[in-house]
């Protein structure tokens, strides 16, 4: 009976070692779970960005407001009868902000 108990104990130790330290053991399992969580977070961010880009594409394809906004912002276009005003800070504020940017 003693040899059988010793054999079963040796098998139990070997199985526990395999479970904790072997290939596909607990350490590998937790590492893979951490990797999966990080990749899922990255995928969620990328999906949100893709959804935003698809919404912008739909707006550009069908909506005139987005086209008008881009023309106004990027090309400085105005409608007939409108006057475009550009506000330029005075020289002292420009010099002060330039001094802060050089720091």
Swiss-Prot record:
Top-level lineage group: Bacteria
A Pfam family assignment: DivIC
Principal subcellular localisation of the protein: membrane
Cytoplasmic side: 1-3
Annotated compartments: Cell inner membrane
Keywords assigned: Cell cycle, Cell division, Cell inner membrane, Cell membrane, Coiled coil, Membrane, Transmembrane, Transmembrane helix
GO cellular component annotations of the record: cell division site; cell septum; plasma membrane
Membrane topology: Single-pass type II membrane protein
PANTHER family tied to this protein: CELL DIVISION PROTEIN FTSB
Family indicated by similarity: Belongs to the FtsB family.
Quaternary structure note: Part of a complex composed of FtsB, FtsL and FtsQ.
Protein name according to UniProt: Cell division protein FtsB
Gene source species: Shigella flexneri
């Amino acid at each position: 009976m003693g040899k059988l108990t010793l054999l079963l104990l040796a098998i139990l130790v070997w199985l526990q070692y395999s479970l904790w330290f072997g290939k596909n053991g607990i350490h590998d399992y937790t590492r893979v779970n951490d990797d999966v969580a990080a990749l899922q977070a990255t995928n969620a961010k990328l999906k949100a960005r893709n959804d935003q880009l698809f919404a912008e594409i739909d707006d550009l394809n069908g909506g005139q407001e987005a086209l008008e906004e881009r023309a106004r912002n990027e090309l400085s276009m105005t409608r007939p009868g409108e006057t475009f005003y550009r506000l330029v800070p005075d020289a002292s504020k420009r010099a002060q902000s330039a001094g802060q940017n050089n720091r």
